[in-house]
């Protein structure tokens, strides 16, 4: 199928239905009026000597992929998207193929992996993610679409996130990931719903802790222990529904009982001086906010989700280049199908973060 790689399609999508992303829309109009494109076709940036020498590294981020796996629901038929799995495959292939070039140390998936916790959807996700096996280590978090699906006669074909049941553990079993050197542990001990992983890059130790959508109190208690016990690691928190595009942490929503984004911040994130970032999806759009934790450490909270764009996201992803010598994390939003970057202020930005200089 042909793809229209220009800003006009994005503006049409943003207009009307996507009022939730007003500021990027107006910025887009301004950019076009000034003769600038919303997109930028350019060489992969930050392809520097620091990356080649291991003095800098990259974290890859996959936002919601639910539409890429949706082959059966009424919503997909309504939008006329058809089978979109190729976009998921293009994402993971691109990450695999650019692992050495960008020194990609790890990949995270922000949840809503599938649309309605259906086996046929999980089979697509498994095939897409397996492209990374043995090449790029990764972890995933559960979104509301990944659990608790109940059939119903509505436009979505059912209700999602009503409980904690999920097929995730069948297709991404704990025992598979427990064999990997980056594996740290899970909660509950016999399931993969919540997990933590660790890796070293550019002379620093990092820990990624993945929390279920609306993590329960017992999950946050476990997470507090993991982070406290690994105080020498720099920690990134991965959870699905945490913050909206208005930069407010979630205070409600969804049927499953558990902690909101604000409660997760209060009960867990802000308590630890080694937590410096939270990554989330769920809400269509982009947003960043930075707050000080209880120990004065700055915590960057970053939302990215492109399911509202054409073809359920059309393979837009993020990657973050950690540059210790500059004490910066450089964030890029890239489309491997179009070979283009989004150059909106909310899409391409730098985050300050003190790191050990990699000599």
Where are these regions (language model features)?
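A short C-terminal boundary segment appended to hydrolase-like catalytic domains
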Residues: 53, 318-359
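Active-site neighborhood of phospho(di)ester-bond hydrolases with catalytic His/Asp-centered motifs
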Residues: 61-63, 106-112, 137-143, 211, ...
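Active-site-proximal segments of metal-dependent phosphoesterases and phosphodiesterases across multiple
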Residues: 80, 218-221, 228-276
